[in-house]
Amino acid sequence: MFAARFDPTKVVREEPKIIPQKRAIPDDVESSDSDQDIEDGVEVGAVSKEQSGTDVTTTRAVDGKSESDSESESESESDSDDEMNFDMGGSSSSSDDDEVSSKDADVDDDGKHTSVLSRFKKTLSIQDKISALEEANTQDILEDGEAHDLAQIPQPAVVRDKKLQVKDISEMKNTAFRDTRKVHYDNSMTKSFEEYSDDLTPKLLNNIEKYFSKSTFPIQTAMLDQYLKLINFTLKTSKKNFTRRIGDILVNASTGSGKTLAYSIPIIQTLSSRTVNKLRVLIILPTKLLINQVFQTMSQLAEGTSLVITVSKLENSFNEEHKRLLKTEPDIFITTPGRLVDHLTNSSISLRNLKFLVLDEADRLLNQSFQNWIPEVMSKFKSDKFDQMPGSIIKMVFSATLTTNTEKLNDLQLYNPTLFATDSVKLYNLPPTLQEYQLQIPSAKSVYKPLYLLKLLEQLSGGKTLVFVRSNESSLKLEVLLKSLIKGHMTTLQIVVHSINSNNSKAENRRLVTDFTKESLPNQTNVLITTDLMSRGIDIENIANVINYDVPISSQQYVHRCGRTARANKDGKAYNMLVGKGEAQFWKDSIDEDISRDVSGCKPISYNDSYNKVHGDENARTSEPTRDLFTSIDSETSDKYNEILKNLTQK
């Protein structure tokens, strides 16, 4: 009536025989192969049922067995499958259905667990063998190799194709004049202006001889010979295209060589035939001091003509200049870059009829951006001029230290340029009438440098002397110190000292320059201390001496400083005060190396030696005849000097 209850205690399970089924793993097995086997799910155990449903066959992979045992057991796998049976307490195939169902469920669970476990153990077995192989290989490498420090891995030699090599950038920058037509001149090229009487208008020739000179300077001779006849001829044939026949002009000439007159004469000659005043000449200068000088030159050359010459300076009211330019258009407009940009922005002037663009002191103009003036001017050319073809404007670039940098000159878009320069391999030239002196001061006596300056001024005795210092602060300090030494009776001569500095008003600085230009009184030495502000283009007559109290920072700066004297073939002297061996070596390597001097001109000499020769007889009885007499200071002078310094410090 009731089904028999299943008693689990009566179930007797015979432990099945474990028959591992392994694959042979080669010694050089790689991890990728083992991973692939695992991914493919290597079938280690299989579960099968016979028709009676009571026999279940299971195979397991067991660690620890040898490969020979595995092979023998795998061969008898089929025979042992039938022997692996579960004895259900002696029950036969006629047992109850509930007991059979329960038994089948238990067998299925055991089969799944066995399969998963066998795969896990298989994976561990493969990993152990791979790790053993890697350790063995690593050990062999360590035994064979020698331990050494970290070193750079040897690299193969770089194979370079010389055809593809790019030139050094520094070399490319200094090739501005490679494709430029060159005209060389020398100091012997001088003529009488009377020889150009056929090429110059009578008024212009008369003004030249009246206000300037009856003979030319070398750079003037070179330019007038090259362009005067060409200008006159092309103006008669085609006024529109004469600029292309001339081309652009680059001039590298020493200071005081007559550059201003060299470009002013051809310009005035060209405009002498004009009938209506239109802006045809634009002259750009770096400072307002140069503006006054160029304006004076142009006005003197144009005397007796109807040419309108206008200047524009920052000190003038912009609104007044704007109204004046709109009312009367000038023939020649002289200005600075900053004010020029202002007028172009406000349409005060038009460049439609422009024929000449002059850059005086061009190296300074190109080195400084000045409100990005070059792109502004070039852009205005394109918008104003009807003739957009290259060469519609003659660009005239003048400087004593003309740059050779292609990057700077490229913005000017030069057309068929011609370079005028002396036949020298060096960058800059000095006037042949300039005598240079090297004044060497020992480093141990550098504190006496102001006293040596005063001693040098005593030897110069009279005339105008320009003293260059490094900064505005140095100018102020040196002025106070020199005046204190003079008041302290460190000299018996009459020396007047002034300085150009930012503490003075503009009007005060102009007054000082004006007073300095006047003739000195007899037995009086006028000294003007200044920075490099006055080293460019300022033409003050009869400056006898230039003293470089502070060494200039470049050969370019040195040329401009020395150019304030020995102008217009007059004699001049430059004194370089060099402290210690360092400054002397710097002057030799960085300044003197770039400077060319005329073969028949003056050469630098030691002032210490020349002083000893002059004053040697006075000190013939000294116990040290070979000592430097100029730098020798007695104890009384030293004490007096130190006392003055002490008093200045306390103030």
Swiss-Prot record:
Annotated CDD domains: DEADc_DDX51 (cd17956), SF2_C_DEAD (cd18787)
Motif (Q motif): 216-224
Region described as Disordered: spans on this chain: 1-114
PROSITE patterns given in the database record: DEAD_ATP_HELICASE, HELICASE_ATP_BIND_1, HELICASE_CTER
Positions of ATP binding: 253-260
Entry comment, domain topic: The Q motif is unique to and characteristic of the DEAD box family of RNA helicases and controls ATP binding and hydrolysis.
Phylogenetic classification of the source organism: Eukaryota, Fungi, Dikarya, Ascomycota, Saccharomycotina
UniProt motif DEAD box: location: 360-363
Protein name: ATP-dependent RNA helicase DBP6
UniProt gene name: DBP6
Entry similarity comment: Belongs to the DEAD box helicase family. DDX51/DBP6 subfamily.
Comp. bias (Acidic residues): 27-42, 69-85
